[in-house]
Amino acid sequence: MSNFTHINASGEANMVDVSAKQETVREARAEAFVHMAPETLKLIVSGSHHKGDVFATARIAGIQAAKKTWDLIPLCHPLLLTKVEVQLEAIEAENMVRIESVCKLTGKTGVEMEALTAASVAALTIYDMCKAVQKDMVISQVRLLEKTGGKSGHFKADA
């Protein structure tokens, strides 16, 4: 269990002490997909969904979620994010929406969880806004795409 940084020698969960770590610029990108029927995607893209602008709402939800990650994930540190960006793209040929989030800060711990939370909550918001139209949408492939900064260095997911 000693390989898990959030577990102490007694096997108890603890927030990692990052006070001695150096501050570095850290950035993370994550993605998620929401698969849906062509008719549902057309409602979103055309802006004719009765609940309003689905992409704008999902974008704001993702940004808000990144800022509250420490409140949602028990052992995450509260972070002073300097950038949160959420982009949504309708891929009509595949009947899905791709969400990509970017989080950045100068700090002592990474922003991977914030980027993953932003993409996840944006996807959940799309589901919430469209569930009256389609209940069998699928959220998939939530993953970290890239992270930079910190002691562990650069990570880039395989394409």
UniProtKB/Swiss-Prot annotation:
GO terms for molecular function: cyclic pyranopterin monophosphate synthase activity; GTP 3',8'-cyclase activity. Keywords: Lyase, Molybdenum cofactor biosynthesis. Substrate binds at L75, C76, H77, M113, E114. GO terms for biological process: Mo-molybdopterin cofactor biosynthetic process. Pathway: Cofactor biosynthesis; molybdopterin biosynthesis. InterPro entries: MoaC, MoaC_bact/euk, MoaC_sf, MoCo_biosynth_MoaA/MoaC, Mopterin_CF_biosynth-C_dom. It catalyses: (8S)-3',8-cyclo-7,8-dihydroguanosine 5'-triphosphate = cyclic pyranopterin phosphate + diphosphate. The keyword Lyase applies. Pfam families: MoaC. The active site is at D128. Gene3D superfamilies: Molybdopterin cofactor biosynthesis C (MoaC) domain. Catalyzes the conversion of (8S)-3',8-cyclo-7,8-dihydroguanosine 5'-triphosphate to cyclic pyranopterin monophosphate (cPMP). This is Cyclic pyranopterin monophosphate synthase. The gene is moaC.
